């Protein structure tokens, strides 16, 4: 009996503790999309990526031409020359894969450029969220944009507009 009473009292007190926590929900994707500097950074990244993609496509076209030429001339080449051309093709293919990895691979040039251009903007948003949390005494701020799944959120809990005001937007 004492255990049941203790359990009921504990659950009752826990309800007050849960209700005492203040939380809010934000949508960082929505916030970032409203920031002009984020759009500019995205545009710059897209332009850079297009340039690098063109560089890779040009090298791929060159490699394809080398393969076509090799296929056409292969029967006329000596074993030594054929081996030399195969080595050239192999090296060119390897260089192309290395370039793709360097530009677009994990922690490649695009990743580094994104860090350089977007990270300061994300930090600015994070600082505004942190300031809002302190000002309004929020215990938790959840981001509904990508990371966690929020199945339902009361729109009055969404403080994205407040974060935008804190950033000077609107």
Regions found by a protein language model. Name each.
Residues 21-170:
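Amphipathic, charged alpha-helical segments and their helix-to-coil junctions
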